Amino acid sequence: MAKKALISVSKKEGIVEFAKKLNELGYEIISTGGTYNLLKENRVNVVKVSDITGFPEIMDGRVKTLHPKIHGGLLAIRDNEEHIKALKEHGIEPIDIVVINLYPFKETILKENVTLEEAIENIDIGGPSMIRAAAKNYKYVTILVDPKDYDTVIEEIKQYGNTKEETRFYLAAKAFGHTALYDSLIYNYLIQKNNIEFPEVMAFAYEKAQDMRYGENPHQKAAFYKNPIKAYGIAECEQLHGKELSFNNINDANAAIELLREFKEPAAVAVKHTNPCGVAIADNIYNAYLKAYESDPVSIFGGIVALNRTVDVKTAEELIKIFLEIVIAPDFEEEAFEILKKKKNLRILRLKEGYEKEYDLKKVEGGLLVQEKDEIDLDENNLKVVTKKAPTQKEMEDLRFAWKVVKHVKSNAIVLAKDGATVGIGVGQVNRIWPTEQAIKQAGSKAKGSVLASDAFFPFPDVVEVASKAGITAIIQPGGSQNDALSIEAADKGGVSMIFTGIRHFKH
């Protein structure tokens, strides 16, 4: 009895050559629909599934392979006498290889203006059923869902007469991953259509983009996975030059891109260890970068710079003056790119347009915290001037700028800003006075005349008192402390204007 291979694929890459090789190795090919037609046109010896089942494809192809003569052939345990007896009684022949990839559901829902009906029609039923059946019976059946594995299977059959059990076991695991991803895409699409924000089940599936040399530290193994649907941000950056991105590179670049997205005007963001160390806006990208660099010329060394305008020659010439890990921008002038390429190891990334809201996920031991991303804009109508003195127009511009930045700094966070640039950033302290002192120390003489943004309220008036002594003229903070009155009193005493936003921006 000839061995049998069932082939039904939506992605036709390499399938004709693979089927011909199976023919040469003595396999009878069974197929359906478009795959059958393709194989027949290319002179592959192939029979229709309906010729095996004795039952035609019906309901516009919705029912093709859901038949005992198919699933019996896949699920039979070959050394079980009762199973073999059942096969003979019902005229079922074993199927040894299954090659399937599924209806293009992902490609369908990514189309513009796709209807729910179109999406539903591209939910594969028979395919996942055969994949699961073949994978479950991996001891006897080889399941293929990825063209990359075709050559391995052919070579093993040539060498051993069959695939090795360890190979079939690996391919079975891969197959269940394939159906898990597929089901996850369907589930999340339907949840979205039902407008359910936090469903009873969270089912995320990601596809591996690359293995990494190591993780956050050299002793940690790591890999990078991409969302198969949402194509934007660091996951979709095009690397134009430089060494392969590391785990920390990707993490830091992501932080830089998230902060950069806050600004519509020309902006430059420098990041180290996911915290901004220099941020600035200006009338052009060259001036924005110079201001960001001058914010902290020490910490930017070895950091990541993200820009939201095309990099010109002047900016490129400044960028190569120091060691940077990565430069990110929407594009690069040809000559500017050639200048940057002189730095052999500099990673140059082109940031693609586009953004979609998604969950913010935080892994904890044994669970997952899921929340909306902190993307609330500053509501000008809810701003409350709580001091006798109101901020000037210039101070308000800097306060808005500092408020955008402080949202992206690890708590407890303080940002000092002046003339559209950060001059001091206090990062990740366990009280509020320490990051204030850190930011003032970093700013030095630039603290005088600057404004201060705090990610959370002041439990005591000490921050205001220290800020006033340093010459800081205006403060923006959420408010809401039991001791707000003391902070307001200290601000009035020091001649500092203060605004309450009613919004907190903790970041952990």
UniProtKB/Swiss-Prot annotation:
EC number(s) per entry: 2.1.2.3, 3.5.4.10
The UniProt record lists the keyword Transferase: yes
Membrane-crossing segments per the record: none
Matches recorded under CDD domains: IMPCH (cd01421)
Pfam families linked to this entry: AICARFT_IMPCHas, MGS
Reactions catalysed according to its record: (6R)-10-formyltetrahydrofolate + 5-amino-1-(5-phospho-beta-D-ribosyl)imidazole-4-carboxamide = 5-formamido-1-(5-phospho-D-ribosyl)imidazole-4-carboxamide + (6S)-5,6,7,8-tetrahydrofolate; IMP + H2O = 5-formamido-1-(5-phospho-D-ribosyl)imidazole-4-carboxamide
Annotated protein name in UniProt: Bifunctional purine biosynthesis protein PurH
Keywords carried by this UniProt record: Hydrolase, Multifunctional enzyme, Purine biosynthesis, Transferase
InterPro entries assigned to the protein according to its UniProt record, in alphabetical order: AICAR_Tfase_dup_dom_sf, Cytidine_deaminase-like, MGS-like_dom, MGS-like_dom_sf, PurH-like
Start and end residues of each MGS-like domain: 1-145
Pathway where it operates: Purine metabolism; IMP biosynthesis via de novo pathway; 5-formamido-1-(5-phospho-D-ribosyl)imidazole-4-carboxamide from 5-amino-1-(5-phospho-D-ribosyl)imidazole-4-carboxamide (10-formyl THF route): step 1/1; Purine metabolism; IMP biosynthesis via de novo pathway; IMP from 5-formamido-1-(5-phospho-D-ribosyl)imidazole-4-carboxamide: step 1/1
Example GO biological process: 'de novo' IMP biosynthetic process
Underlying gene: purH
Origin: domain of life: Bacteria
Coiled-coil stretches: none
GO molecular function, one term: IMP cyclohydrolase activity
UniProt record similarity statement: Belongs to the PurH family.
Any Gene Ontology CC annotation: cytosol
Native organism taxonomy: Bacteria, Bacillati, Bacillota, Clostridia, Thermoanaerobacterales
Comment, domains: The IMP cyclohydrolase activity resides in the N-terminal region.
